[in-house]
């Protein structure tokens, strides 16, 4: 149940991305609850045209549940960065609702009238401008979706419009429950290794890993892998992928990830991270500093615990992990305090 709406038997939420190079369009089709004409008026006509500044001012004091990132209105507003024209076709779940068609060419005027959609949900069609036509190519669309949305919690399918029955296929592009979102006790060694190979395209087995799982005082999950380092032949280059609610944000955000951890490979998902601020603001954000300190502490705890309870393994790995530990001690005083007895 969703309000008064009974979901159809076997219902599974999904988003279809449909490319059409001939028409130069990109469609996003969902099977969600749709919108009434009044909701289009509120969420599109009022929010999307209120201006980014007014929108941010309106929502700056909202709680995490109402954070700006991921909010439909602001995301929709940005569609005009790539599209000369945008159409919306939607049908609400509400009994007796009439389908709505809305269109705008990027100015302040729009047209809204009864639509012809027959299934509950929403379709947004972008008529791409000449500078970004690459995005209606299925290969480019697949590349972008896989980079940013490989672990989104709703299934995403990609297809090409007007394909023949023989050609027609929907390709699932994402995993809705990434390994880092599971409890560590539910994960097997093979799952950790498979995830490492898939995300980092590295087929050399890592030495070990740390599964971060924290709900208080902030929400943070992730997995950090210690790769095997051959100092003679390889440079020490790691990568830490930062996610927000399972959506990829960027690699190696040094304002969030302690510098010495850049030698590792891993993923960090922190929905509480403020994304509507500049990189320079992140440097001076006390909350971000707490996140960074927590990550550093968990790594130190893991290494200290390994030295105490798995001394033989710790000694075996020492040649590989010593550059990381020594670098961490130089860069982070608290890390150094915790690791002094284990060097």
Each predicted region: which residue ranges?
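GHKL (Bergerat-fold) ATPase N-terminal catalytic module, capturing the glycine-rich phosphate-binding loop
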Residues: 1-135, 143, 150
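GHKL/Bergerat-fold ATPase module in large chromosome/replication-associated machines
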Residues: 68, 86-109, 129-132, 139-343
């Amino acid at each position: 149940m969703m309000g008064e709406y009974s979901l159809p038997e076997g219902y599974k939420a999904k988003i279809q991305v449909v490319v059409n190079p001939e028409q130069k369009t990109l469609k996003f089709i969902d099977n969600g609850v749709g919108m009434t004409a009044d909701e289009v008026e509120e969420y599109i006509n009022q929010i999307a045209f209120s201006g980014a500044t007014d929108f941010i001012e309106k929502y700056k004091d909202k709680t995490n549940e109402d954070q700006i990132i991921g909010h439909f209105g602001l995301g929709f507003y940005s569609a005009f960065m790539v599209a000369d024209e945008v159409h919306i076709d939607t049908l609400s779940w509400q009994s007796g609702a009439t389908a709505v068609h809305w269109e705008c060419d990027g100015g302040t005027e729009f047209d809204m009238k009864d639509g012809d959609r027959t299934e509950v949900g929403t379709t947004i069609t972008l008529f791409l401008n000449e500078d970004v036509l690459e995005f209606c190519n299925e290969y480019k669309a697949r590349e972008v979706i896989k980079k940013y949305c490989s672990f989104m919690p709703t299934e995403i399918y990609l297809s090409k419009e007007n394909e023949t029955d023989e050609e027609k296929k929907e390709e699932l592009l994402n995993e809705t429950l990434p390994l880092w979102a599971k409890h560590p006790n539910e994960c097997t060694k093979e799952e950790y290794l498979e995830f490492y190979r898939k995300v980092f395209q590295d087929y050399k087995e890592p030495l070990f890993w740390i599964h971060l799982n924290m709900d208080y005082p902030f929400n943070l999950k992730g997995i950090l892998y210690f790769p095997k380092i051959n100092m003679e032949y390889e440079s020490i280059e790691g990568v830490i992928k930062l996610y927000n609610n399972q959506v990829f944000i960027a690699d190696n955000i040094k304002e969030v990830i302690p510098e010495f951890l850049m030698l590792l490979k891993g993923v960090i998902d922190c929905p509480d991270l403020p994304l509507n601020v500049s990189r320079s603001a992140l440097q001076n954000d006390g909350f971000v500093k707490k996140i960074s300190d927590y990550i550093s502490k968990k790594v130190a705890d893991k290494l200290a615990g390994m030295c105490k309870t798995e001394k033989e393994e710790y000694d075996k790995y020492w040649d590989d992990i010593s550059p990381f530990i020594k670098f961490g001690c130089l860069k982070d005083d608290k890390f150094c305090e915790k690791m002094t007895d284990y060097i």
